[in-house]
A protein has these predicted regions:
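Catalytic machinery of carbohydrate-active enzymes
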Residues: 1-327
Length: 327
């Protein structure tokens, strides 16, 4: 798909409006970095990233929990916005559709009622074809969401994927013993995605026996409950994303369910293992580096309408892989 890149002039103002979910936030951050690398002056609207803005000096990070899309559209040449903000505005009686310089991105599906495929996005009088889009255009293609957001940047915005992006900067130094420290994120916002606490305890015991220092990570609201489930281990909880980023600088490996912790770890260059019932090439696996593995069940079966998968997770794949890294 050939794209005329003439729309993007050096210094052009672009706002990228993310959503609260950590995994999605990492994708919008990557898109913001790509736009900055192409010469745009980028404002990233993200409440989760605002406390960590000192690590994002190349972007203007705004922490609005409920962004004013109308105001952003008036202040920027282009706004790329997570679809939920359009939905929420519509429910509140605010019509954002006349804003012709706002492009909406959804994960896998654009809501039909807005008929976005019939609306053009224009920047300085130039039409950006297909700017309203889903990030993942084909969930069976085997691509990660990182690869999909890069394709959007390349095919819709005309950005060169070979241009290096800035990444996080001015981070705390990596801990001296990080190569033997591992963080487990045992929960997600969706209980059906969570691996069993018994399985995580077994994994932690095996890793400790092999010389790893294992700690767990949850939200502040989960911390007390998780500490009861994992009494032999430190359970960390952080009030903001900066605290979590600082903690992960003390680790080299993240084990998680299908959750934001794995995406953040991957973004930071850590080795990740994602425990999920889904197939190994599922779209939402971490994909920011080459050291991401999906641990999925050897088989599953249905019982009383539920998929049984947790007993069949091959945890040995994790400690075997880490043993090879240590050699």
């Amino acid at each position: 798909m050939a794209v005329d890149k003439a729309w993007l002039r050096p210094g052009m103002k672009v706002a990228v409006v993310s959503c609260p979910a950590l995994g999605d936030t990492t994708l919008f951050l990557r898109l913001a970095w790509r736009l900055h690398a192409a010469g745009a002056q980028v404002t990233l609207v993200s409440a989760p990233l605002y406390p960590a803005r000192e690590y994002l000096p190349d972007l203007e990070v705004v922490g609005d929990a409920r962004p004013d899309i109308v105001q952003l559209a008036g202040q920027h040449d282009l706004v790329i916005c997570y679809i939920d903000w359009l939905i929420l505005a519509s429910r509140a009686g605010v019509d954002l559709l006349p804003l012709s310089n706002v492009a909406y991105l959804a994960g896998k599906k654009l809501p039909r009622q807005f008929r976005l495929e019939q609306r053009s996005v224009t920047v300085a009088g130039q039409v950006l074809a297909h700017a309203h889009s889903v990030i993942c255009r084909d969930p069976k293609a085997g691509k990660t969401m990182v690869q999909w957001i890069d394709l959007y940047a390349q095919e819709v915005l005309g950005l060169d994927p070979a241009v290096p992006i800035p990444g996080l900067k001015a981070l705390p130094p990596v801990a001296a013993d990080a190569d033997r420290r591992l963080a487990i994120f045992p929960t997600t916002p969706h209980a059906s995605k969570n691996y069993s606490s018994r399985g995580f305890r077994r994994l932690a015991r095996e890793l400790v026996a092999r010389g790893w220092q294992v700690e767990f990570v949850g939200t502040p609201a989960e911390q007390a409950s998780l500490q009861r489930q994992y009494p032999d281990y430190t359970v960390n909880a952080f009030s903001d994303l900066k605290g979590l980023i600082d903690f992960l600088r003390s680790c080299s490996v993240v084990v998680s369910n299908d959750s934001g912790g794995g995406h953040l770890g991957s973004l930071m260059g850590l080795r990740t293992f994602t425990i999920t019932r889904r197939r190994p090439d599922f779209t939402w696996r971490p994909g920011f580096n080459a050291f991401n593995s999906v641990i999925h069940p050897r088989f599953t079966f249905k019982w009383m309408g539920e998929t049984v998968w947790r007993p069949f997770i091959p945890l040995s794949r994790i400690w075997d892989a880490l043993s090879k890294v240590s050699q």
